A protein has these predicted regions:
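Bacterial N-terminal signal peptides that target proteins for export
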Residues: 2-18
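Long, charged/polar, soluble alpha-helical segments
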Residues: 29-178
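C-terminal segment of classical bacterial N-terminal signal peptides
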Residues: 18-27
């Protein structure tokens, strides 16, 4: 009886190691994005089309820009630098995800023209504000790296939207027989 029980701990340890490795290598997209609130994550999950998701990410990016403007308008608050860095990173994440969804929508030949046009209209506004912040010099020195990343992400999103508009042909026009 004791002889049969000895392999059990070895089998159990092997199983637990395999389960741990499987859990560690599970896809990252199944996890909640750390820069989205629970309500925002829920909206993304509930969106039925890629176009709606892109528009949501653009609106979340706009919200982060608005919060950045507020933070710079009220300089004396506690933990301000931390919040600003978090907002800049969250903005870059939203823009990156919106841009990634545009590329995915084009690859899958989905109807995302409205979302592409929204990205093309809103992203230049975001870029102008970020460049204005970057030009402030010493007052934004501690945010410079994150700000540069956000500017790069916005430039990439603008470029991706322009490329996607060229690649994403409009749907065929249905004509009535005469």
């Amino acid at each position: 009886m004791k002889l049969a029980m000895r392999p059990l701990p070895l089998v159990l340890a092997t199983f637990l190691c395999a389960a741990g490795i499987t859990a560690a290598t599970s896809p990252a997209f199944a996890q909640k994005k750390d820069y989205l609130s629970d309500a925002e994550s829920e909206k993304i999950r509930d969106a039925e089309t890629t176009s709606e998701r892109i528009k949501l990410f653009i609106s979340f990016a706009a919200d982060r820009i608005k919060k950045l403007q507020y933070e710079f308008a009220h300089p004396g608050e506690l933990h301000r630098d931390e919040r600003i860095n978090t907002l800049i990173n969250a903005y870059a994440g939203c823009i990156d995800d919106g841009s990634d969804l545009i590329q995915l929508g084009v690859d899958k030949q989905q109807e995302i023209r409205d979302a592409i046009k929204e990205m093309q209209s809103r992203a230049p506004e975001f870029l102008a504000y970020l460049k204005e912040l970057s030009a402030k010099g010493r007052s934004v020195e501690q945010f410079k790296d994150n700000l540069d990343d956000a500017i790069d992400a916005t430039n990439d999103a603008i470029r991706d939207a322009a490329d996607a508009l060229k690649e994403n042909a409009p749907p065929p026009v249905r004509r009535r027989p005469q």
